[in-house]
């Protein structure tokens, strides 16, 4: 299974160095400046060429845009000039600037990159310096992402040997800690992107389980996987029902990280892992059905989060549950009108087999509770309705606990991942009632994102719970900001930040 960034991003050497004592050895040097600063540039390799380029109008030093400047000097590094405004760089601008610089370096296949840290960041206190180092490394690695292709003559992905941050003054411990966390967050996100981008004939529930087991082995996590027989024996009717129409049987995947002596205060993170979604008997339209390779984006987000946790090894407890199936039409597939029994014992009237994500999540949520979760976050490409409401820019949120959401929202603010809370009034909960079962899985009319989320939340029972509908944000038609076309790995950084903070 080809995962584009699994190797080189682990191997790239990243460090911070004091500028005064350093001999810069690089294929590319990244510098920041306003137009006026570049016009009078000095003190870095290629400064004269940079000044001449700006004066002649070759580039305008637009904020967060990266420009290649030919120095004209033999064996000299390529200069990548990144524009900025007069005001101090924000964390969002810093991430994006480094992502743009990385994309330029990938395009020109430059392997050793040096970044001259702006004075504003050098003068920061230790806490701010750690944050800035985090943003720079994270932004660079997110921008360096390259999707695997399956072309006969495809070039191998460009790899980076080193990324060095050069600062006039250096709070070494703070910078090193920021580098460590920034790299971990980026690696978790790019891992999730890789999984999301895999074709549906490559990634099926069993191979997703294999990926999870490999991740567990890499980071020393506890893991177990339930196969279809065990799923049936346990009475996980939601997951079993969705998966029974496919020749690729379902899997319930569990990863456990215990960072404290006692198994208490446990974050339960639950991901929807539909490796391909045809809609089942309630068949989707053919247009854009190929994008349903991303219907396991919630599972990818949670595995990416466990990658971050495994690297940073915080004093936290986390149980990750992935409910994985392939939703296919067949003679034995789930049908509209069927009534199934979930792992919780609640019965569900299936009105639409294309509302399958909430069925598998129902069992995943109950299993996470059984395994000790004391608070729950689920992520799923759950509804098309969230894209109508929020587009591909913002992740929709439904919750039963405003205090828990406030913590999560603060984390999202720090990671610059946009989220928006939707209402959860009792009237919406009432819409889930069925005449023939405890719940129905589809509701006619509007409020589809809200009611789908609340369906999942039913299985949280009394626990604090946050639902993330990433159907609009998990897979993009074109690149935007630090996110590439295709799988984005959305919410990895925010979920990890919530747990770590």
Show where each model-derived region lies:
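A generic structural signal for tightly packed, nonpolar segments enriched in small/aliphatic residues
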Residues: 1-8, 15, 87, 209-501
